[in-house]
Amino acid sequence: MSGTVLVVGSINVDLVVSLARLPEPGETVTGGEFARHGGGKGANQAVAAARAGARVRFVGAVGDDDLGATAVDALAGEGVETGAIARLDGTATGVALIAVDAEGRNQIAVASGANAMVDAAMVDAALAAEPLGPGDVVLLGFEVPDEAVVAGARAAATAGARAILNPAPARDLPDGAREGLLLTPNGLEAATLSGETEPAAAARALARRTGAPVLVTVGADGALLVDGGCIEIAAPEVEVVDTTGAGDALNGTLAAGLAAGRDLEAAARAAVEAASASVQRPGARG
């Protein structure tokens, strides 16, 4: 029987402008096309996990505004269970302003809004309603406060569940969320966390720190999995439209694979394939 993926993470609305090129500091670039998408790393990862076949529960928060209602409805429409998402009075839903160029590269600015209010009590309430089991996977990210991340990590450890931490945006690993977590940074985040600039060296350093495997994404080259040895997972060559959300597709698919009982390398390979597919479509969720 497959386990459940519990995502503790962010929910945003993405406001996207597609441009011929990205602006330099202080520069205005006109002629772009506008679109609005569901976003937030946690929400994107939850959607990816659900599309990969997992049962997905979500712990997070939105504001008491139309954007929040739309964001929650979009998650529910993807099959994500939204009962543990708090609607906070007097708070705005998180928003990301995204510029994407003709090569699919992006610049992103985020107003966290309700995401900054996600706390351990929300995690505890969700787990009181339905505790974790050994086959479950908890997927955590740094777009919500440390206390929520630590609560999710500790609950996973207590239940014997797998915990994945996508340390984005990169910051120091909090006490209580270091040992035993599967880290999934990109190359820049791995370098920031480890002090090592070369991805394989950074992955090994992080694995020594956590005592657990590390999966470092390296863009078009795929990913490096350190689990004892170092395994290179190549990404297929694809035509890139938009790289926004590629890491989220990887993390959600990875969590779904592990919840389904796949071994780590097989789940990681499927996750890289999903990330490669995601960059061929516009928007963080394709």
Language-model features: locations:
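Gly/Ala-rich phosphate-binding loop of Rossmann-like dinucleotide-binding domains
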Residues: 50, 157, 259
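Short beta-strand scaffold segments in enzyme catalytic cores
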Residues: 47, 95-99, 107-108, 222-226
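Conserved beta-alpha-beta core of the PfkB/ribokinase-like small-molecule kinase fold
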Residues: 123, 135-204, 212, 221-222
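Glycine-rich phosphate/adenosyl-contacting loop at the front of the ribokinase-like
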Residues: 1-61, 66-77, 240
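Conserved phosphate-binding/catalytic loop of the ribokinase/pfkB sugar-kinase fold
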Residues: 87-88, 98-137
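A glycine-rich helix N-cap at a beta->alpha junction
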Residues: 74-90
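Conserved phosphate-binding/catalytic region of the ribokinase-like
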Residues: 1-5, 172-176, 199-286
